[in-house]
Every structure is written in C-alpha cells, then in structure tokens.
A protein has these predicted regions:
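Short, functionally important secondary-structure microenvironments
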Residues: 1-72, 77-155
Length: 155
C-alpha cells in the first residue's frame, strides 16, 4: 500500500471530488476513471499520466491548478484512455514526445476543454501546425518537426 504525504493526500481528495461530480454529469469519464487505480507518482514531470491500469498524479504539479483546471487536466487524461493514445495507438518510427504532443493536440481540438492554466497541454498553435488532422497524422508531423530541432529545444 502506498503511503501518501499530506500534499498527496489532499490532492487525491481533490481528484476524487472531481470524479464524484462526473458520476452525475459525465458518466463515461466516471466509468473509465473508476476502472483504473489512482496512484501518486513523485518522479514524473507532469500532472497526470496513465498506463497499466493506473492513473498517476504528481501532487507537486496538480496543486498548481485550481479545481476547474485540475478537472480539465484530468478530463484530458481520461480521454487519452478512451482514445487509446498515445500508448496503445503508437506507430513504429514515431518519437515518444511526438506521440504525447499529438495526443494533446488531437484531444484539445476535438473535445470541449476549458482553461488548464499551464503549458502542460500542447495545441496546434503551440507548434504552428495546421488544425484538423487525426492523431496518427499529428504523430508524423510532430516527429518530423521534432527531428529538426536541437535536443535542447525538443519537448
């Protein structure tokens, strides 16, 4: 069993409050979230990450967001599970960072997402690329774009 510090415990309660609201308003998000285990991860460099039946959160990042922003970031992460990207739909030859950014771009332009208050979530405007492509096409576009950047400028 994972031992949480006070900040991690408080953030877990905030996340649970968001999810409880989904029970009445966003049944699909609630059901998908409920099929995963919520776990604190102190090492990762973002608010949320999913994989292997878990939704991980880093309290150092989640606490920077107000409740509405936290809800939007969590919604994006659950949408990744529903859409099976970036992990399950990863294509051969696609960079990891490009697939994560392509997931952001696709979700933000196709789902109703409010302000997340940070630069954690990338948009087509972030990279000055056209809108309207599917996830797989954005993976290719961003892999090509990132391969032209020096390592210090890569995402």
């Amino acid at each position: 069993m994972q031992v949480l510090d006070d900040i991690e415990f408080d953030e877990k309660l905030r996340i649970r409050k968001v999810v409880e609201g989904w029970l009445w308003n966003e049944n699909l998000l609630y059901d998908v979230f409920s099929s995963h285990i919520l776990t604190a991860n102190r090492i990762m460099g973002c608010s949320f990450r999913t994989g292997q039946g878990r939704i991980e959160y880093n309290a150092k990042f989640t606490r920077r967001h107000d409740d509405k922003q936290l809800a939007e970031l969590l919604k994006i992460e659950v949408m990744r599970i529903i859409l099976k990207h970036p992990y399950t739909r990863r294509q051969e030859g696609i960079r990891d960072d490009a697939s994560v950014c392509a997931s952001d771009v696709t979700i933000v332009q196709n789902c109703r997402i409010g302000d997340v208050g940070s630069n954690e979530i990338m948009t087509a405007e972030t990279f000055n690329i056209p809108k309207g492509y599917c996830y797989e096409e954005y993976c290719k576009i961003l892999t090509q774009l990132f391969s032209t950047l020096p390592p210090s400028e890569s995402v």
